[in-house]
Amino acid sequence: MTAPTLNTTRSQELFSAAQALMPGGVSSPVRAFRSVGGQPLVFDRVKGPYAWDVDGNKYIDYIGSWGPAICGHAHPEVISALQEAIEKGTSFGAPCALENTLAEMVIDAVPSVEMVRFVNSGTEACMAVLRLMRAFTGRDKVIKFEGCYHGHADMFLVKAGSGVATLGLPDSPGVPRSTTANTLTAPYNDLEAVKQLFAENPDAISGVILEPIVGNAGFIQPEPGFLEGLRELTKEHGALLVFDEVMTGFRISYGGAQAHFGVTPDLTTMGKVIGGGLPVGAYGGRRDIMEMVAPAGPMYQAGTLSGNPLAMTAGIKTLELLRQPGTYEKLTATTEKLIAGIKEAASAAGLPITGGSVSAMFGFFLCEGPVRNFEEAKATDAERFGKLHRAMLQRGVYLAPSAFEAGFTSLAHSDGDIEATLQAFRESFAEIA
């Protein structure tokens, strides 16, 4: 079945104008559709599981603002709380009682967090936690994993996933080799490689940081024993274990990936969901480590808008919605139905596919599985994914515009939305086979 051609005239006009105003016409690279081809859409509004572009086309959305919209876009209770909060001001630049409330909720939920510091983005949280790892241990080196993305700070732009090329050197011009000299990399799910790095760098490694489920190199789950092995290795070598839960935090369970897998790190970074759609980040962990942070301790970190009342309000209301009984069971059922249907549709069209899901996070690769690390992820047929992405847009489904990004469901996605999405996949896979 051939899908009708969408009218995206206004999107094209706006994007053309944007390219003279902003680098590449966007405020974040993946939005430019470079890896999937075609013109990016310019959105006008979002509500629930849907997004509308400036030409009036409606889409079922599986990006969810790249993760925050777990309750659905513009949830009425979140909007109502924000409307009330904004009457009191948008930012105080001073302590705010709402910070206490959200901090208590995060500490109660996340096993590793005994104290928390709010910032304004996941990148900012990861930058701060890197400094904290070094300050606490007195060591400079850090281990990260190929394909894991921890924001755009210089130190982390090494084999960083999110479509960034993996060259073994800094992944962006402007990042000095001296800056990344202390960044050690290993393949995800490879404990032996981590053991080797510790052996080659005795008493020099401050810690290991990773996405407990990789979401920026597609969707890659930890193999049994991998997270547990990292926990043992870091303890053995006096290093810290850090989970970057910017994506997984409050998404795959109320306590994040660490609660889901039963492995407690020393420090955790968060973002996305805890801001309910507003800019936010956080890092937290053991009290003895967090007390290194200024003004309690000597490690300096600050932020003009950190802990602002609007982000705190949206975060509080979002977590209140998520802790209601049955929330994660519903998210799991929705996402499992979706990914099972996607794999069935690809197989019916004679296309190779592998993929999976955990709660409200999913992903697939257009190749034979298994995919256990970034090197194996690169076997996916990115060109065919681009064709799939365009075919799905024509049928009213908005997927991440990259073969190397996880997808997200929400409490707002209905059975009808899932079935409409799967029908679009059936038609699209048949079209591109």
Swiss-Prot record:
Keywords: Chlorophyll biosynthesis, Cytoplasm, Isomerase, Porphyrin biosynthesis, Pyridoxal phosphate. It is an enzyme of class 5 (isomerase). The modification N6-(pyridoxal phosphate)lysine is found at residue 272. Its EC number is 5.4.3.8. Its main location: cytoplasm. One of its GO terms (cellular component) is cytoplasm. It is found in: Cytoplasm. GO terms for molecular function: glutamate-1-semialdehyde 2,1-aminomutase activity; pyridoxal phosphate binding; transaminase activity. The keyword Cytoplasm applies. Pathway: Porphyrin-containing compound metabolism; protoporphyrin-IX biosynthesis; 5-aminolevulinate from L-glutamyl-tRNA(Glu): step 2/2; Porphyrin-containing compound metabolism; chlorophyll biosynthesis. It catalyses: (S)-4-amino-5-oxopentanoate = 5-aminolevulinate. GO terms for biological process: chlorophyll biosynthetic process; protoporphyrinogen IX biosynthetic process. Its cofactor is pyridoxal 5'-phosphate. Belongs to the class-III pyridoxal-phosphate-dependent aminotransferase family. HemL subfamily. Homodimer. HAMAP family: HemL_aminotrans_3. This is Glutamate-1-semialdehyde 2,1-aminomutase. It comes from Synechococcus sp. (strain WH7803). The lineage of its organism: Bacteria, Bacillati, Cyanobacteriota, Cyanophyceae, Synechococcales. The gene is hemL.
